[in-house]
């Protein structure tokens, strides 16, 4: 991927417009998790430290375009950013009527981009209005890269210079390393409740990986495709044929979709359900498969330890309940111990990484959510394509 990077730009004396993703959650009117704000600080600091003035823009929540309500106000986000930077960060509500006059080192924030008419439709005139504020546009919002919107795509077309911020460049470099030129053997874990939501990812990765580990409800559908009984476990009977095709595709290239030989079952999906380990052949009609068994976990852990690239999306069991967390824990620890370059993404995956204390041992943790999944699917990300066009 060829794109310009913020860290390669001379920003001294310039005004830099940074599209960040500071869409943070609130509880009782206060920010409950500032991870996204902290993740965006590197680009802001780079600009300030190198003599630029900075305008930050972000979305917050899902406001109605053209309407402004108190809960849509980015003022608490600006205040929190200011406290982390040790600066006063003002919110600009009338930036279209009054272009801000800024000095080097100043940091300001535009009001919530999603209240601007034309934002979601990628309106070119709105993109030009954003671009008119700056000498350099920086996209640092990988989490919105799969959407073509005025603050991510149109502005990149219109700005004098358009480049990737520290966070965006890190994401793209890591994803490129994992998917474009992976060191082999390459192993992917794709898990979740439904094949239907991950089918395009499974099909795309089956073309790239040497081993494709599936887990959760997805694995149950693959077990059905192998003719195994899964009791009353979650599965999609209408996708059994698709699952067979993916297994055949992997087998044809000398790879495999290694399925569990033992599982952890319960009679009910509940925090206090009794967990029982069974061979797959012994699963009863009223059993629910809620995790992989210890033998399967050990076999998959060996695959991961021998890998040179690992892509991880989704836990292999109901790890929120400790009695069904063993499989996901074993795989997390195997990835942590592996020499492989590992990249992980998706909300449940990040929660599992945090729970099992392996954050520092994962090569790269993607903040992307939907953008991460679409990259895995092999789809073009509009905001990234816009940066590549400008970097050519």
UniProtKB/Swiss-Prot annotation:
> InterPro entries given for it?
Phosphoglycerate_kinase, Phosphoglycerate_kinase_CS, Phosphoglycerate_kinase_N, Phosphoglycerate_kinase_sf
Residue positions annotated to bind substrate are: 21-23, 36, 59-62, 114, 147
Q: Which reaction does it catalyse?
A: (2R)-3-phosphoglycerate + ATP = (2R)-3-phospho-glyceroyl phosphate + ADP
Q: Which residues bind ATP?
A: 198, 320, 346-349
Enzyme Commission (EC) number: 2.7.2.3
Q: What GO MF terms are annotated?
A: ADP binding; ATP binding; phosphoglycerate kinase activity
Q: Which PROSITE patterns match?
A: PGLYCERATE_KINASE (PS00111)
One GO BP annotation of this record? gluconeogenesis
Q: What is its main location?
A: cytoplasm
Short name of any one Pfam family annotated for the protein: PGK
The UniProt keywords, alphabetically, are:
ATP-binding, Cytoplasm, Glycolysis, Kinase, Nucleotide-binding, Transferase
Gene Ontology CC annotations of this record: cytosol
Q: Where in or outside the cell is it found?
A: Cytoplasm
Pathway given for this chain reads: Carbohydrate degradation; glycolysis; pyruvate from D-glyceraldehyde 3-phosphate: step 2/5
Q: Which family does it belong to?
A: Belongs to the phosphoglycerate kinase family.
Please describe the quaternary structure of this protein. Answer: Monomer.
Protein's name according to its UniProt entry: Phosphoglycerate kinase
């Amino acid at each position: 991927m060829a794109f310009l990077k913020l860290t390669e730009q001379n920003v001294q004396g310039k005004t830099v417009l940074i599209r960040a993703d500071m869409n943070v959650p609130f509880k009782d009117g206060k920010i409950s998790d500032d991870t996204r704000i902290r993740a965006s600080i590197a680009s802001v600091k780079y600009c300030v430290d190198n003599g630029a003035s900075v305008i930050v823009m972000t979305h917050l929540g899902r406001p109605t375009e053209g309407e402004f309500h108190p809960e849509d106000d980015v003022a608490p986000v600006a205040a929190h950013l200011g406290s982390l930077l040790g600066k006063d960060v003002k919110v600009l509500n009338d930036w279209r009527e009054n272009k801000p006059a800024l000095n080097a080192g100043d940091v300001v924030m535009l009001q919530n981009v999603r209240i601007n008419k034309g934002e979601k439709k990628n309106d070119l005139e709105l993109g030009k209005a954003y671009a008119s504020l700056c000498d350099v546009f920086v996209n640092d919002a990988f989490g919105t890269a799969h959407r073509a919107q005025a603050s991510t795509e149109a502005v990149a077309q219109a700005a004098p210079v358009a480049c990737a911020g520290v966070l965006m460049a890190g994401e793209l470099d890591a994803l490129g390393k994992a998917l474009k030129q992976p060191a082999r053997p390459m192993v992917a874990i794709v898990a979740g409740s439904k094949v239907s939501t991950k089918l395009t990812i499974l099909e795309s990765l089956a073309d790239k990986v040497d081993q494709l580990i599936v887990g959760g409800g997805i694995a149950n559908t693959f077990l059905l495709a192998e003719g195994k009984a899964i009791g009353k476990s979650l599965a999609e009977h209408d996708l059994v044929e698709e699952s067979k095709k993916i297994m055949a595709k992997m087998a044809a290239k000398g790879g495999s979709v290694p399925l569990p030989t033992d599982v952890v079952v319960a009679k009910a999906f509940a925090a206090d359900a009794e967990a029982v380990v069974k061979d797959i052949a012994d699963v009863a009609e009223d059993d629910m498969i809620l995790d992989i068994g210890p033998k399967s976990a050990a076999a998959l852990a060996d695959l991961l330890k021998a890998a040179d690239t690992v892509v991880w999306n989704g836990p292999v069991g109901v790890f929120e309940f400790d009695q069904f967390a063993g499989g996901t824990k074993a795989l997390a620890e195997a990835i942590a111990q592996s020499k492989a370059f590992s990249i992980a993404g998706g909300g449940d995956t990040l929660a599992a990484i945090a729970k099992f204390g392996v954050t520092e041992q994962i090569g790269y943790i993607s903040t992307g959510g939907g953008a991460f999944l679409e990259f895995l699917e092999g789809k073009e990300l509009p905001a990234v394509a816009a940066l590549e066009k400008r970097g050519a």
